A protein has these predicted regions:
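Single conserved hydrophobic/aromatic residue that forms the stacking wall/gate
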Residues: 1-7, 11
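Conserved SAM-binding loop of SAM-dependent methyltransferases across substrates and taxa
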Residues: 13-23
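Conserved SAM-binding motif I beta-strand of class I
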Residues: 24-29
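Conserved SAM/SAH-binding beta-strand->alpha-helix loop
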Residues: 31-33
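S-adenosyl-L-methionine
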Residues: 35-75
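Mobile active-site "lid"/loop adjacent to the S-adenosyl-L-methionine
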Residues: 56, 74-104
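Helix-to-beta-strand junctions that scaffold the AdoMet/dcAdoMet cofactor pocket
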Residues: 109-111
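C-terminal catalytic and target-recognition region of SAM-dependent MTase-like enzymes
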Residues: 113-172
C-alpha cells in the first residue's frame, strides 16, 4: 500500500487521487480551513470512505514525529505554500526552507519508496532548482530519476497555456 504525506494541496485533488488509487493517505496541512475543504472534496467525490487521515499540523513537525515513531511512507506529495507565519510568528519562506523540508521529509520514506512529488506556485523556485533538490536529496540515497516542468493552466480564448508554477518528481 502506498501512503502519502501531503502538505498544502492547492485543489485537494492529489490526496484524493492517491486515495482513489488505493493508498492509505495522511493529508497534512497547517490550515484547518484547507483540511476541511479537502475533506468536503473527498465527500463530494464519493471518497469519504477511503483511508485518509486528515491532520491539521505543521508538516515538518508532523514528519519529525513520524520519524521518531518509526513510521514510513512509500510516497510523498508536497505542495508547500510560498510563504507562511507560524502561531509563534515564525516566518516560513519557500525559497529559504524548501531544501531542509525535502531533506526532513526524505527521512520518513520507506526503504523502497515509489515517488516524491514537489509542486510550487512561486516564481522563486524554477523546475530546474526543484529537480536539483530532489536529485541531491533523494537521488543520492535511492537512485531513480527526476523530471521537472512548468505547471500551466489552459487558456481557452487563445489556445495557449498560462504558466502558474513548477513541478518536479523523483521516482524509482
Amino acid at each position: 500500500r502506498v501512503r502519502s504525506s501531503a502538505a498544502s494541496d492547492v485543489y485537494k485533488r492529489q490526496t484524493l487521487a492517491c486515495a482513489e488509487a488505493g493508498a492509505s493517505v495522511s493529508h497534512v496541512d497547517a490550515s484547518k480551513g484547507m483540511v476541511q475543504w479537502a475533506r468536503e472534496n473527498a465527500t463530494v467525490s464519493g471518497l469519504s470512505d477511503k483511508p485518509i487521515r486528515w491532520l491539521v499540523d505543521d508538516c515538518e513537525k508532523f514528519v519529525q514525529r513520524e520519524i521518531r515513531r518509526g513510521k514510513t511512507y512509500d510516497a510523498i506529495v508536497m505542495d508547500p505554500p510560498s510563504y507562511g507565519r507560524g502561531p509563534g510568528g515564525e516566518i516560513w519562506k519557500l525559497e529559504d526552507c524548501i531544501y531542509d523540508l525535502v531533506k526532513t521529509c526524505s527521512g520518513v520514506l520507506s526503504d523502497e519508496p515509489l515517488f516524491f512529488l514537489l509542486n510550487s506556485y512561486t516564481t522563486g523556485l524554477s523546475p530546474s532548482v526543484m529537480a536539483y533538490i530532489l536529485r541531491d536529496v533523494l537521488g543520492t540515497r535511492f537512485g531513480g530519476n527526476v523530471t521537472a516542468d512548468e505547471i500551466g493552466l489552459p487558456v481557452e480564448a487563445t489556445g495557449g497555456v498560462l504558466p502558474c508554477g513548477s513541478t518536479a518528481i523523483w521516482q524509482k
